Amino acid sequence: MEAKLLVLFCTFAALKADTICIGYHANNSTDTVDTVLEKNVTVTHSVNLLENSHNGKLCSLNGIAPLQLGKCNVAGWLLGNLECDLLLTANSWSYIIETSNSENGTCYPGEFIDYEELREQLSSVSSFEKFEIFPKASSWPNHETTKGVTAACSYLGASSFYRNLLWMTKKGTSYPKLSKSYTNNKGKEVLVLWGVHHPPTTSEQQTLYQNVDAYVSVGSSKYNRRFTPEIAARPKVRGQAGKMNYYWTLLDQGDTITFEATGNLIAPWYAFALNKGSDSGIITSDAPVHNCDTKCQTPYGALNSSLPFQNVHPITIGECPKYVKSTKLRMATGLRNVPSIQSRGLFGAIAGFIEGGWTGMIDGWYGYHHQNEQGSGYAADQKSTQSAIDGITNKVNSVIEKMNTQFTAVGKEFNNLERRIENLNKKVDDGFLDVWTYNAELLVLLENERTLDFHDSNVRNLYEKVKSQLRNNAKEIGNGCFEFYHKCDDECMESVKNGTYDYPKYSEESKLNREEIDGVKLESMGVYQILAIYSTVASSLVLLVSLGAVSFWMCSNGSLQCRICI
């Protein structure tokens, strides 16, 4: 009985032993990240690298409003289509907006030669100065400048023509050869537009220009071309059997352009001195223009984000994240978030870091939980936590800085005859996009794996730090915790945490308690062995007595015959 009481007392004393545990932070975060080896790992903290939202608005870009062309397209705006009069004073923009119904372009049917290239050139233009390159009143005294009108370009119910071009016809009965030059003295490139008319019949050719064998010649240091009218019957378009082809060139500073013609010239009236240097672009969007400002615009809406990637739209203008096909790019900064199930016994034992993290520790990533006669509590290890925060912050910033190359990505322009080139270009762009997406996803997977391993290593290092201090003054109890062989008050606990634990000071007490506990274990084992032998012998005797009694009863009533032979 004394042995049993001694064992119970020792068990009770063991439960009261002072303990210290090493563990890590946990919280109620539901953030998940992917690693090379795992999917949807819940972590305490993470940062998102992928922007997937927009405001649904077309905004000013860095304080400069866009140019909304409305129902007009670039051709109608530059030629001066009468339906585009609201754009006559437009001279600066951050980007240009066409809509899905921007159909007012060339009112007189024909081709706009190298139109796609012109649109591409406008991607680097943010403003221009519109000026009369050849004043209407004084430039063409020998030719008619008021009768060149058409019902195809009507205005207020009357025939008219483009605002920026002059359709010159014969004056009286003659169309004398004309020659007119302009020298660029604007200090910047000048955009010059003109046209050539192709009548359907020789009769119309003579009616308009008198000369049947007319020509148009345009020349500069970089452009030189001679045109002859293509007189042929054509199906009517917009009520016209004739056609006009439209041309353009960029005239360098100091260069001279000369127009020479004996008929069929659609002469430039206004030209545009271009201000280049900024990233502009042309987007097609039906989103509304609002009084807002952004640094990045997509056709769907503005992005106000400093993230390195976005999956909103591949077409962007301004300082924009790189477009990728990914749906999730989240980088882990914290630890695996596995809150421990805090099963509490008589003295409220706390599960250690092997079983899960601590939601009670809120001021650090790694730390301690202690329990002694003075109470219990959590304390973060600030040094290891701060070192980890600094390292991970630097890593995240470095990744964002390296990948956050912000730029404009506008669509490339191709005409109907360049479909094979366009298709090839799309395949190349898709290939680059796949590579960018793969690189971004792989980078995040690898860094997440490294971050979680880094945290695991830090917890293990903290555990080993405590273990190396305590040595045999405490024992490991298998859940990230140590049980002291001596009394460890709050001052003692603090010394373990800050690395100043005095091992010799507690070694003698620990040695005595270790020996006492080991002795109790041995004595308890001897008692249990004696009890086991006694129990076995007693059970055997009871069995023999019972068997004898049954046999005697059976013999007495004749159920069993007993013979004793001598």
Swiss-Prot record:
Biological processes per GO annotation: clathrin-dependent endocytosis of virus by host cell; fusion of virus membrane with host endosome membrane; fusion of virus membrane with host plasma membrane; viral budding from plasma membrane; virion attachment to host cell
Intrachain S-S bonds: C21-C481, C59-C292, C72-C84, C107-C153, C296-C320, C488-C492
All ranges on the Extracellular side of the membrane: 18-529
Glycosylation sites: N27, N28, N40, N104, N304, N498
Positions bearing the site annotation: Cleavage: R344, G345
A Gene Ontology term for the protein's cellular component: virion membrane
Keyword rRNA processing part of the UniProt annotation: no
Entries under SUPFAM superfamilies matching the protein: Influenza hemagglutinin (stalk), Viral protein domain
GO molecular function per UniProt: host cell surface receptor binding
Reported modifications of this chain: Palmitoylated. In natural infection, inactive HA is matured into HA1 and HA2 outside the cell by one or more trypsin-like, arginine-specific endoprotease secreted by the bronchial epithelial cells. One identified protease that may be involved in this process is secreted in lungs by club cells.
Superkingdom per UniProt: Viruses
Residues making up the signal peptide according to the UniProt record: 1-17
UniProt keywords, alphabetically: Clathrin- and caveolin-independent endocytosis of virus by host, Clathrin-mediated endocytosis of virus by host, Disulfide bond, Fusion of virus membrane with host endosomal membrane, Fusion of virus membrane with host membrane, Glycoprotein, Hemagglutinin, Host cell membrane, Host membrane, Host-virus interaction, Lipoprotein, Membrane, Palmitate, Signal, Transmembrane, Transmembrane helix, Viral attachment to host cell, Viral envelope protein, Viral penetration into host cytoplasm, Virion, Virus endocytosis by host, Virus entry into host cell
Compartmental location: Virion membrane; Host apical cell membrane
Membrane topology designation: Single-pass type I membrane protein
Note: Major glycoprotein, comprises over 80% of the envelope proteins present in virus particle.
Task performed by this protein: Binds to sialic acid-containing receptors on the cell surface, bringing about the attachment of the virus particle to the cell. This attachment induces virion internalization either through clathrin-dependent endocytosis or through clathrin- and caveolin-independent pathway. Plays a major role in the determination of host range restriction and virulence. Class I viral fusion protein. Responsible for penetration of the virus into the cell cytoplasm by mediating the fusion of the membrane of the endocytosed virus particle with the endosomal membrane.
Subunit and interaction comment: Homotrimer of disulfide-linked HA1-HA2. Interacts with human CACNA1C.
Similarity-based family: Belongs to the influenza viruses hemagglutinin family.
Name recorded for this polypeptide: Hemagglutinin
Species, as recorded: Influenza A virus (strain A/Duck/Australia/749/1980 H1N1)
Source organism phylogeny: Viruses, Riboviria, Orthornavirae, Negarnaviricota, Polyploviricotina
Gene expressing this chain: HA
